[in-house]
Amino acid sequence: MRAEQNILHQLIGRFAGKRMLAVGDLMLDEFVWGRVSRISPEAPVPVVNVTSETYYPGGAANVARNLREFTPDTALMGLAGADRAGRRLVELLETAGIRTEGVLQEDGASTIVKTRVIARHQQVVRVDRERKVALTTEQLARACGYLERAVEGVDGIVVADYGKGFLTQPLADEICRLARKHGKILAVDPHPHTSLVWRGATAIKPNRIEAFSAVGLPPADPVEPVCRDEALLEAARRLRHLWEAESLLVTLGEQGMLLFHGEAEPLHLSAHAQEVFDVSGAGDTAIAVFALGMSAGATPRQAAELANVASGIVVGKLGTATVTPTELRAALAVI
């Protein structure tokens, strides 16, 4: 066990030298913090007295934030509006040291904003402001042109599909083609409603619901032990055939993760979370750390172990959070 932990620590040390690119739907996460002291006389809802507001990059931009915690060479590609929210998002990214030359800012696009109202450490309500707009032919050409220029200078590509319209099958095909051509790690967090095929990716990381949805199977209740969950195993078998990915990592919430790789038996990794305050962004952390691990020379099992521990840390934080190398090392030390 000690030898394996030493290897994991060494892998974390290599993350800083990796060059990573995050691709996907961009959002601005707004958190409105306040106190609740009474119920509204107008409707049976709490009245929140606002004390502060904070903003974070969300969606694929949060994947980039997680990557940036470990490596200074992090870039992002996606679509944002040339509106106030878009300008705020780009400013936050640049302040964090994330390269934004791949962010397409368009006058006709509206930046997606997700507003969460928090009181007493609980989410009271979430308000989404979004308008899905498919990429134009010109925007697709610009995105592909950026990818063509950027891919040779990165070690890994991380795709986060939130189903908001930036990722289309032609763009997915180009990402897969370039990753194969240049021998780059390609890790994908898919969305159940887009039905995009990521054939030949290094790793795909759906959650349980996404795994069933992607192959057209009805969701089934979890089974213990996880490795005997026949419905999940069948969904995974079909996914591996559909996507031809080298590894499939299914995240299962409180059940942890299930890793499929090659001809080996599925590997179940138990969850490590001590307390769960907020699961938003846990998938972003998992795919970012898994991709970093693979880019640093980890085996799929080692990369999954790091991703699993990192996810257990981030769900213990409130808001769109990230994990630092120090936190990950500390968590590994007590496992």
Where is each model-derived feature located?
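Positively charged, low-complexity intrinsically disordered leader regions
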Residues: M1-S37, L332
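Substrate-binding N-lobe of the ribokinase-like
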Residues: R2-L11, P41, V45-V113, A331
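A short, aliphatic-rich alpha-helical micro-motif
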Residues: F15, V151-E152, W198-R199
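Structural motif
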Residues: L21-V23, R126, D155-V158, A187, ...
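Conserved phosphate-binding/catalytic loop of the ribokinase/pfkB sugar-kinase fold
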Residues: V103-A109, R116-V151
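Short acidic, glycine-rich surface-loop motifs adjacent to enzyme active sites
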Residues: G153-F166
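Conserved phosphate/ATP/ADP-binding segment of small-molecule kinases
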Residues: K164-P266
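Conserved post-catalytic alpha-helical subdomain immediately downstream of the catalytic base
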Residues: E246-S247, H272-A331
